[in-house]
Curated annotation (Swiss-Prot):
Phylogenetic classification of the source organism: Eukaryota, Viridiplantae, Streptophyta, Embryophyta, Tracheophyta
InterPro entries reported for this sequence: Ribosomal_uS15 (IPR000589), Ribosomal_uS15_bac-type (IPR005290), uS15_NS1_RNA-bd_sf (IPR009068)
GO CC term (a single one): ribonucleoprotein complex
Organism of derivation: Aethionema grandiflorum
Coiled coil ranges: none
Keywords: Chloroplast, Plastid, Ribonucleoprotein, Ribosomal protein
Complex formation: Part of the 30S ribosomal subunit.
Protein name: Small ribosomal subunit protein uS15c
The UniProt record lists the keyword Plastid: yes
Pfam families (alphabetical): Ribosomal_S15
Entry's family note: Belongs to the universal ribosomal protein uS15 family.
Amino acid sequence: MIKNAFISLQEKKEESRGSVEFQVFSFTNKIRRLTSHLELHRKDYLSQRGLRKILGKRQRLLVYLSKKNRVRYKDLINKLNIRELKTR
């Protein structure tokens, strides 16, 4: 439901499945799905590794977006209910 609504919002702008926002959104869906899987299967180490890789990819995209356009970054963080990046 949420995914379809977000996709329809993104498609109204244009064919933007390669946009940073859409990529972060799809990674967030994968992360949530893997997290629920790992709650049931705690010893699934390959899924744990995949989760860490996806988390890293999403973090790199969020760092890129926060440097390029802070307003779009804040808007995306609020829409997806994820925490803001830690700054060093």
